[in-house]
């Protein structure tokens, strides 16, 4: 455990601290004049092209446009067009390492909105001679109508079908969803029971399509460094830090391995939560899997914990997460006697 802890800390200093980033033109951006948003879309494209492929660029990057509702569609599509065109021109003018771009679509209420975005992205790829799949999309579901239709169907499933394979994840909008249910501001938190229900519904919908992940919503209580060095300020900072950590650990335990961070102060907490989540369960998970393999994939138990094929699949999910989060390296798992690929192919 100590060796693994030391190595993962060492890797943290050599890997990108920020892995996923969205340039926001929706709620976080607010209402601006058309001229102002036009200029920001163009300048954002130039900036992205300049840093893409460098050590400054996150692994995954994209923009969040406004909703494709009747009221917002014109502005959303104009911003998208200016951004994509500006990015294309900048990529031609200077070498860019940008290999793909993620378009985040908020407040999705029907499958037609998704189909419209897909049609537009198809056209952009052809127009700018980009390979198919250069654009992928994320869908933010934040209204009750996205979870249950009047006819008893699950609209989210039709969203995924309409994405034509471009959708990579479903994201949860905490505040729009809870507001739609009549929940007051005091109850609008990421751990509200209504949010738990919604995220489970999202997991079920995501399981119907391949390679779709579910991202948790925002934690609005920010652990801002206090401006004044007073005991009260320090206590508020510590309380906010603990709250963020507890909510992130809760999300990880429930299978939501991604969430929205609004402020840089939240990033260290997320890294700590991911690391603790893996390391505190690692020894037990390794022991359970090795015992299961030693018994030729028959049911087994370690320390009173029963394992069969179904629970071992959960262990494999854990190890996949440990590697994808950067806490563990695949070679470290092999050195501990765990070969995830081999076990997965044998059960």
Regions found by a protein language model. Give the residues of each.
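Expand to "…catalyze enediolate/carbanion chemistry for C-C bond making/breaking, isomerization
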Residues: 1-347
